[in-house]
Amino acid sequence: MINYEYPLSERVRTLLRLEDLYDRVEYFIAKNEPLEHHVALLSIFEILEVSSRADLKSDLLQELERQKQTLEALRDNPEISEEALDNVLWQIDQASSRLFQASGKVGQELRENEWLMSIKQRTNIPGGVCEFDLPSYHYWLQQSAEQQRHDLQQWLAPFLPIRDGIMIVLKLLRESGKTSSQVAYQGVYQQMMAGRMAQMLRICLSREYPCVPEISANKYALNIRFTTQEGMQRPKAAETDVEFELTFCNL
């Protein structure tokens, strides 16, 4: 099965972008080759840009507090495991505490590092990080993998409280949804929202279908059009019925 997630708000869109970047940087930091660590640093620069939104930290803190209050209300529910509930609440408390302790603008330490910012500036130029452009960076890339990994982890560290908060919020968001089986006849599916609230849609599709969903949604209607991709040709509308699972996620 292949999962597709579609954010219905700018906030969730930002969280999904950051989640993808965190996954990427952690993957490449664990590698050993200089080019892989170069990609890790570029991903840290992207995290710096995406997380620079002024209200990101406060949004996460507010959402974590709201979820904590919601979960606390479930404490006397016999269908809820007390142990599981306590574990989630502990994770929320830990993430909130780390966010509170992260003073100032997210990533300010990196912005004040002139050497890193000189590299970041050159990355905006195609081919701008050649060794003759940035000899000091070329020298760093020739150091041991352990030294590079240590440096990268230090540069990533200021963003980890944000990552922890994002992981909890997205986990709760994904688990909030109710899944239903649907069919897109001739590759097209439409549904009136009728006041249904959702922050994210999830579409789960069997790998046997050689098609991908194109999604458009607003507060009035949801439209999904499945298209097929053949080689380098333009996508074409699917001509067969497509069975899929649809989940509306909302906190």
Spans of features found by a protein language model:
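Charged, amphipathic alpha-helical oligomerization/scaffolding segments
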Residues: R13, R17-D20, R24, V39-L42, ...
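Alpha-helix boundary/N-cap detector
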Residues: S9, R13-L16, D59-Q62, E83, ...
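Extended, charged low-complexity segments
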Residues: Q199-L251
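Hydrophobic/aromatic-rich structural module bridging two neighboring secondary-structure elements via a short loop
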Residues: S52-W115
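Alpha-helical rod/repeat scaffolding segments in eukaryotic adaptors/tethers
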Residues: Y4, E33, P78-L85, E109-E112, ...
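Charged, well-structured binding/catalytic surfaces in domain cores that contact anionic ligands
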Residues: A95-M200
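N-terminal ordered "arm"
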Residues: I2-Q62
